[in-house]
Amino acid sequence: MSRRTEKVASLLQQELGAILEKEYPRGGPLLTVVEVKITADLGLARAFVSIIGNEEERAETMEFLNDETKNIRRILSSKIRHQFRRIPELEFREDLLYEKASRIEELLRSVRKESGENE
């Protein structure tokens, strides 16, 4: 990733986080923009979001984000239009790293428990 795309991705991550926090306050699961990856031509930005909640809440939140993508992009455009000629298309993807880490911790705990019981 070039220096420019890194700067753009960082700015988009900050702005998307602020938009989701201020413009779309929800009483549901905790939602965090973890990372934004942007194509070299700055035409597409993939925002990876971490959603802490149960399976149903995560599915509803992803559906909400996908339904609101155009509105979120419009709000984003109004905030950063003076910095870019063209605002990238947005795509939201769920970042499952937190869930995977929790599962690994759970497995490690069970292994420790079993090895402690067998000794």
UniProtKB/Swiss-Prot annotation:
Please name one Pfam family that this protein belongs to.
Answer: RBFA
UniProtKB keywords: Cytoplasm, Ribosome biogenesis
Give TM regions: none
The signal peptide annotation in the UniProt record is none
A GO molecular-function annotation: ribosomal small subunit binding
State where the protein is found: Cytoplasm
Record's Gene Ontology CC terms? cytosol
Task of the protein = One of several proteins that assist in the late maturation steps of the functional core of the 30S ribosomal subunit. Associates with free 30S ribosomal subunits (but not with 30S subunits that are part of 70S ribosomes or polysomes). Required for efficient processing of 16S rRNA. May interact with the 5'-terminal helix region of 16S rRNA.
The family line of this record is:
Belongs to the RbfA family.
Against NCBIfam families, the record matches this protein to: rbfA (TIGR00082)
Indicate what this protein is called per its UniProt record.
Answer: Ribosome-binding factor A
Recorded source organism is: Chlorobium phaeovibrioides (strain DSM 265 / 1930)
